[in-house]
């Protein structure tokens, strides 16, 4: 039987403690270094777009491309799916995003704008339902979801 668990700070810390009791090397390592705290991203749309941008390239290059991508939009306003749908795909390509990734980002924007992915209730869904919804978007696989 599989149990679905939402990975949060408490679950992660509990898991690390359990692993540490079974592995002295891990325990020593964790005593030396702090447990990483993963920030929780509330802008699901941008998080998914950013995941596509970062795929299969170095973090440094992806950060530069991501920053150039964001510069296409008004920095004072949260980028919306409508903004992405309105922008010409060539402009997206010109900041260093491949044609394929650009089309995936447009697909994500389309899914959010049509409420195929509803940001308002996504935090209430279990992991499997979120994965099912996200992977219904062309260009979003399990690893991205």
Per-range role (PLM):
Residues 48-52, 56:
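Short, aromatic/basic-rich helix-turn unit that serves as a nucleic-acid recognition element
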Residues 43, 47, 125-128:
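An alpha-helix initiation/capping motif
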Residues 12, 34, 51, 73-74, ...:
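A short, structure-level motif marking secondary-structure boundaries and short turns
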Residues 25, 29, 57-58, 62-138:
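Alpha-helical ds-nucleic-acid-binding substructure associated with the helix-hairpin-helix region
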């Amino acid at each position: 039987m599989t149990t679905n668990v939402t990975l949060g700070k408490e679950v992660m810390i509990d898991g690390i403690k359990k692993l540490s009791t079974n592995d002295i090397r891990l325990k020593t390592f964790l005593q030396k270094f702090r447990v990483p705290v993963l920030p929780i991203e509330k802008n699901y749309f941008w998080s998914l777009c950013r995941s596509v941008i970062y795929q299969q390239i170095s973090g440094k290059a992806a950060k530069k491309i991501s920053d150039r991508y964001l510069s296409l939009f008004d920095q004072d306003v949260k980028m919306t799916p409508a903004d992405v749908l309105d922008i010409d795909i060539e402009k997206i390509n010109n900041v260093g995003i491949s044609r394929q990734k650009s089309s995936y980002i447009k697909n994500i924007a389309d899914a959010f704008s049509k409420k195929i992915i509803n940001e308002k209730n996504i935090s209430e869904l279990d992991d499997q339902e979120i994965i099912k919804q996200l992977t219904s978007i062309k260009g979003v696989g399990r690893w991205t979801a």
